Amino acid sequence: MAARVCSKHVSALLRARTSTGVPRRCYASAATAPSTLPAGQRQAIEREASLRTPDPAADSQTARLVESHAPFMVPTYVRPPPVFHKGEGCYIWDIENRRYLDFTAGIAVNALGHCDPQVSKILYEQSKTLVHSSNLYYNPWTGALSQLLVEKTREGGGFDAARVFVCNSGSEANEAAIKFARKYGKSVQPDGSKHELVSFQGSFHGRTMGSLSATPNPKYQKPFSPMIPGFKYGTYNDIAGINDLVTEKTCGVIIEPIQGEGGVNVATQEFLLALRKRCTEVGAVLIHDEIQCGLSRTGKLWAHAALPKEAHPDIVTTAKALGNGFPIGATLVTEDVSSKIVTGDHGTTYGGNPLGCRLAHNIVTRLSDPELQKDVLKKEARFRQHFVRIHEAFPDVVQEVRGRGLILGLQLSADPTPVITAARERGLLVITCGTNTLRFVPPLIISDAEIDEGMEILESAMNAVFREPGHIPGTDGQQEMRASR
């Protein structure tokens, strides 16, 4: 809160709310002395005592820890007050033992929930066996993961994947894809004329120089300009502009089938078909960035698997859920693309390490389960039922629902950041994207009861922001990149 009440004023009230949930008995005296606190402070104390997870006070253990660490950290993020230290399933706890229901999954990372028992077991076992040996040598798990990704992609209706490059993150996966597209273009046109790369407004492909050059937001590109030359930017879902955008000079086109950071914008089938057709006409590589929307978040292993074969890409990039919190990424390519890559063209020191690959092998095996994918679609339907009710309650605020599966966006007519604050102080973590959009990317294992619980909290938070008197400050920084305003 903007004017946080010091913890010593509310500690007595908060102690009454024990972790067991058993209320303490209070006996009123025959005559209660009137409070000597100013009315504003008294109201603030009463309000804070009524919240399930009020943000830590300025004199709290949390604040002291943050203040001691902040001077040593490069200020790349704006963070809200809680400090998280423990997670289980769809819940996460801060260092003062406040529990939060997590609708963010670490930005679509923890698809199997926090501290999944199988993931934890593999981390323990493999860390005692072999963690890293470099890509100068073979290990049992890099090839096993690559084979599994290829086989599950084909079984799940995805593109003609043939080979895999394993790395450490989504940005690295996209950097590899960009390099592979450039190499493909050089193979077709050795004079280097086929070098241009195309991406789209509203996209987010990463923060390294290549992936940032593919992310056309002037606010974030300008401090690091000039960008890598050869990038062109088009309008998402604009079929009419494709032919002028993608030309004989184009070596590659990179697109998110569902834009995550951009606002949960879904590419139309017609647009993706036209894009594939044009890439084939000019001999350009089509790259689908499925880092956020892939690995069964849409109800299929890959979002593009819902498309006709004629719309499928040549390269797919993935990360996030691939490691369920462990840093790992991958770039999947067709045999045609792979045939242009030779020894020494690309590499990584840590990528493909046996620890990460063994983890990812377990995770992909489980996320590719058809029953899990069916459940994702059932859970989407449950979320949408709640969205209908919330729209009926706030018809002037809720404008649209976008997305597929468990990557959903609720478009608001007003700034959503106060809702983020109000939800967090009531026990729910949710994030934003695009412009005035609430983003829902919970663990894929979330239960119906947890969905219901979270949506009840969200409605309460929206009621506090849009109907009750008083100011709730916004929580900024709850998305990777905020659109220019």
Model-inferred region functions:
Residues 1-48, 483-485:
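N-terminal mitochondrial targeting presequence
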Residues 31-485:
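Conserved N-terminal phosphate-binding loop of PLP-dependent enzymes in the Aspartate aminotransferase
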